Amino acid sequence: MGKGVGRDKYEPAAVSEHGDKKKAKKERDMDELKKEVSMDDHKLSLDELHRKYGTDLSRGLTTARAAEILARDGPNALTPPPTTPEWVKFCRQLFGGFSMLLWIGAVLCFLAYGIQAATEEEPQNDNLYLGVVLSAVVIITGCFSYYQEAKSSKIMESFKNMVPQQALVIRNGEKMSINAEEVVVGDLVEVKGGDRIPADLRIISANGCKVDNSSLTGESEPQTRSPDFTNENPLETRNIAFFSTNCVEGTARGIVVYTGDRTVMGRIATLASGLEGGQTPIAAEIEHFIHIITGVAVFLGVSFFILSLILEYTWLEAVIFLIGIIVANVPEGLLATVTVCLTLTAKRMARKNCLVKNLEAVETLGSTSTICSDKTGTLTQNRMTVAHMWFDNQIHEADTTENQSGVSFDKTSATWLALSRIAGLCNRAVFQANQDNLPILKRAVAGDASESALLKCIEVCCGSVKEMRERYTKIVEIPFNSTNKYQLSIHKNANAGEPRHLLVMKGAPERILDRCSSILIHGKEQPLDEELKDAFQNAYLELGGLGERVLGFCHLLLPDEQFPEGFQFDTDDVNFPVDNLCFVGLISMIDPPRAAVPDAVGKCRSAGIKVIMVTGDHPITAKAIAKGVGIISEGNETVEDIAARLNIPVSQVNPRDARACVVHGSDLKDMTPEQLDDILKYHTEIVFARTSPQQKLIIVEGCQRQGAIVAVTGDGVNDSPALKKADIGVAMGIAGSDVSKQAADMILLDDNFASIVTGVEEGRLIFDNLKKSIAYTLTSNIPEITPFLIFIIANIPLPLGTVTILCIDLGTDMVPAISLAYEQAESDIMKRQPRNPQTDKLVNERLISMAYGQIGMIQALGGFFTYFVIMAENGFLPNHLLGIRVTWDDRWINDVEDSYGQQWTYEQRKIVEFTCHTAFFVSIVVVQWADLVICKTRRNSVFQQGMKNKILIFGLFEETALAAFLSYCPGMGVALRMYPLKPTWWFCAFPYSLLIFVYDEVRKLIIRRRPGGWVEKETYY
């Protein structure tokens, strides 16, 4: 059994040992997969097939031969995509990005504690506490993120259906049903309507067989399958049926030519799993932010390390200072804050029908600048619907809305009654059983898409089709075939005063018209003259130009004298007229746009997002839907439109004059990357029609070359490579295939394009709110770190301890920081351009300068003011404190004098110092009130925004209550060395809090009054 030419290109190559070779090979494989499908089995005659596969075309393989091939090729199943082991996922959460910074902090703390323990007799435990707490923070937030991701992957698992699929094969001349996984190359397989195709088949005989290829090629119409070789392209030819597509009607028999990963579907799945998803924008932002923070921390640490050596501290003390400064700079609570903010948004999106698989995808959607959307089922309803009728020489519009709230037409015309009768009788579609309580449009139908559309339309307009069919019982029928291009049936006519037999026919309009000599107008038969033929032609062109699928309908009342009751009609040797019929009308169908889509596309446009339609459907249909949903907006022309308007050949039009553009897949095949870039750059509204899955991938890569952040929507297997390659892949939850759901980052549970726009809005909002959260959290770093610096430089007793810093970062600041995630959008965020990931960072210099250089400095002043007030009240005036540190911290000196000559023992001094730590801590809480309120907005006044955020108000109360609890709770003096404060000491920082609020309101006022001015350039983060 020789291997065919096509086969060799499918064989997955062996994996090479060396890293570089491996990488080069992977790239080569990807390029190979991006090429179009190549196979030659569709060109072979039956004899050649028999020789190539050694299969008897009537008896099939022998069981023994099948077992040999199964052992050689392996089971007929797709290799599951490589999954990441759970422990690796967990480690990623524990050691990725921000966590790494905290781990380094923890290690440094243990190091400092080790140095102190080795050099001092009674070391302080601060650094030990700090190290333990930091480690705990990382582990807890790591577990939290891991749990969140595991939860969404559980939902993913539940999507997979566990029913093993069966296939009917012929072996040793006997039909047997086996597991589809056991099907081998060369097997003779039978399929019937409702079956899933078990492998790639070369059809050798068929009877009215149609398959639904939409998951593979994106065509919404069922495609006929027959033994005829009709097209060079294996995806277009009729004699190949593809693995995992569905047979919708008829029967067929075929030989298996490819199984498992070597099938066309298998190649696409391999293509998807071989693609590397890039880093998400938010991950890049957090990395950039860590670089900034680490940079600042190390710079400060090293500067003060050198400074303390110059100030003649011992190098051990200097190392302790270095570590202290670096740790004080790490915002311990931020990791948890970011995780919680993303989780909250993911939950909010799930309520709006967007299931996010990994948290970071939440924000990616917000920075999207291009959406490549599939047409069928995403932009459209994925159900063929009657859109227009042409009868009585005029076009009538049908109601295509999802809830039947649209237009209606005159249903009393005698011609309409005749037309609806033909559409109901000359129709094999039937409603499935037990659905009487469902609305008509929601009922499931057995039959092809066009006939289902006619059935539903007639049922809605004229009542029960079943009763109509019972009244006019069917006698004989000629089913639709590709040579005649019509379907005909003859029925008993129960109407009194009319002949006993009614012949009804439907089919391709031009073929039907050729068989007619008269036409029904207002219920009266008229001869079909040239004028009426022109009217027909115009109507046909108009409906076809709307991208609709048009069918013609005609009938004939068969005269009783020729066809008496009981006449034997013969469909093989036709003994009844099929010419000189009476033309009744046209009905056209379309898969109509979803109701919410035009509005969603409009929102995308005002948000600066380019929506590109990519579909396997016909260019005319694609263009019509694109116009219907606003992807091509009114007044925008394609090159062809301009040529038609100016009456010149297309070649004379400058392509850059056209805003819109419809690109055919076959043209895309021959384009260089530069030509594709040209199209993507110079046309604002683009439709790609008749595209293959590989081309979808090329389009996504083209958009990414332009620097766009690309979201791709799709439901078919054919979309999975593009879903994986895109910055964010969006799969359909209802119609989506398993492969596409695995490749995507987000799943639309209601399959509605409008949900994506909701997602974009949420993504932009979370980016804004994360900025605010970070600005709020970072500000308190300055009042936390300056006490340490002044302690080193001015040699004063330490104003704020390590434990109190932790109480701020992991205690009082947490809830307020998270509450900012609930803040509403301050301006219309869907009216601005998508952010540019190169320039518009989550944390930029302006944010750092605001948090550290301005607000943070005011906060530090507030803290020091409180510190000096308490020291002075206890007898130590500021000038007396300078240079006192060494004697102050010496536990053997018990007679340190204050400004009034009073002597203090070591224990007494420490109680004053720790009271100062507590007061400094409370002052930071007081100034953080103002900081939280000003962080609510970046441009608007707080008075415009209002205080509607209930969580934020709770946050203010929570941080105050926690501060009071830590200060006044009995036993805190022992546990955390925090002491009760006089009520007046709480008020020391109030003026500074007010100053922060006023300062920032004035700054925002100037920004609003002078947009683009110096203040905005320097301080708008």
Swiss-Prot record:
<feature type="modified residue" description="Phosphoserine; by PKA">
    <location>
        <position position="941"/>
    </location>
</feature>
<keyword id="KW-0740">Sodium/potassium transport</keyword>
<feature type="transmembrane region" description="Helical">
    <location>
        <begin position="950"/>
        <end position="968"/>
    </location>
</feature>
<dbReference type="GO" id="GO:0016887">
    <property type="term" value="F:ATP hydrolysis activity"/>
</dbReference>
<dbReference type="GO" id="GO:0006883">
    <property type="term" value="P:intracellular sodium ion homeostasis"/>
</dbReference>
<dbReference type="GO" id="GO:0005524">
    <property type="term" value="F:ATP binding"/>
</dbReference>
<dbReference type="InterPro" id="IPR023299">
    <property type="entry name" value="ATPase_P-typ_cyto_dom_N"/>
</dbReference>
<feature type="modified residue" description="N6-acetyllysine">
    <location>
        <position position="9"/>
    </location>
</feature>
<dbReference type="InterPro" id="IPR008250">
    <property type="entry name" value="ATPase_P-typ_transduc_dom_A_sf"/>
</dbReference>
<keyword id="KW-0067">ATP-binding</keyword>
<dbReference type="GO" id="GO:0042470">
    <property type="term" value="C:melanosome"/>
</dbReference>
<keyword id="KW-0630">Potassium</keyword>
<feature type="modified residue" description="N6-acetyllysine">
    <location>
        <position position="21"/>
    </location>
</feature>
<feature type="binding site">
    <location>
        <position position="485"/>
    </location>
    <ligand>
        <name>ATP</name>
    </ligand>
</feature>
<dbReference type="InterPro" id="IPR036412">
    <property type="entry name" value="HAD-like_sf"/>
</dbReference>
<feature type="active site" description="4-aspartylphosphate intermediate">
    <location>
        <position position="374"/>
    </location>
</feature>
<keyword id="KW-1003">Cell membrane</keyword>
<feature type="modified residue" description="Phosphoserine; by PKC">
    <location>
        <position position="16"/>
    </location>
</feature>
<dbReference type="GO" id="GO:0005391">
    <property type="term" value="F:P-type sodium:potassium-exchanging transporter activity"/>
</dbReference>
<keyword id="KW-0597">Phosphoprotein</keyword>
<dbReference type="InterPro" id="IPR023298">
    <property type="entry name" value="ATPase_P-typ_TM_dom_sf"/>
</dbReference>
<feature type="transmembrane region" description="Helical">
    <location>
        <begin position="130"/>
        <end position="150"/>
    </location>
</feature>
<keyword id="KW-0007">Acetylation</keyword>
<feature type="binding site">
    <location>
        <position position="719"/>
    </location>
    <ligand>
        <name>Mg(2+)</name>
    </ligand>
</feature>
<dbReference type="GO" id="GO:0036376">
    <property type="term" value="P:sodium ion export across plasma membrane"/>
</dbReference>
<keyword id="KW-0739">Sodium transport</keyword>
<dbReference type="Pfam" id="PF13246">
    <property type="entry name" value="Cation_ATPase"/>
</dbReference>
<feature type="topological domain" description="Cytoplasmic">
    <location>
        <begin position="337"/>
        <end position="770"/>
    </location>
</feature>
<comment type="subunit">
    <text>The sodium/potassium-transporting ATPase is composed of a catalytic alpha subunit, an auxiliary non-catalytic beta subunit and an additional regulatory subunit. Interacts with regulatory subunit FXYD1. Interacts with regulatory subunit FXYD3. Interacts with SIK1. Interacts with SLC35G1 and STIM1. Interacts with CLN3; this interaction regulates the sodium/potassium-transporting ATPase complex localization at the plasma membrane.</text>
</comment>
<keyword id="KW-0472">Membrane</keyword>
<feature type="transmembrane region" description="Helical">
    <location>
        <begin position="319"/>
        <end position="336"/>
    </location>
</feature>
<dbReference type="GO" id="GO:0030424">
    <property type="term" value="C:axon"/>
</dbReference>
<dbReference type="GO" id="GO:0016323">
    <property type="term" value="C:basolateral plasma membrane"/>
</dbReference>
<feature type="modified residue" description="Phosphoserine">
    <location>
        <position position="666"/>
    </location>
</feature>
<feature type="topological domain" description="Extracellular">
    <location>
        <begin position="107"/>
        <end position="129"/>
    </location>
</feature>
<feature type="topological domain" description="Extracellular">
    <location>
        <begin position="969"/>
        <end position="983"/>
    </location>
</feature>
<feature type="transmembrane region" description="Helical">
    <location>
        <begin position="842"/>
        <end position="864"/>
    </location>
</feature>
<feature type="transmembrane region" description="Helical">
    <location>
        <begin position="287"/>
        <end position="306"/>
    </location>
</feature>
<keyword id="KW-1133">Transmembrane helix</keyword>
<dbReference type="GO" id="GO:0042383">
    <property type="term" value="C:sarcolemma"/>
</dbReference>
<dbReference type="GO" id="GO:1990573">
    <property type="term" value="P:potassium ion import across plasma membrane"/>
</dbReference>
<feature type="topological domain" description="Cytoplasmic">
    <location>
        <begin position="822"/>
        <end position="841"/>
    </location>
</feature>
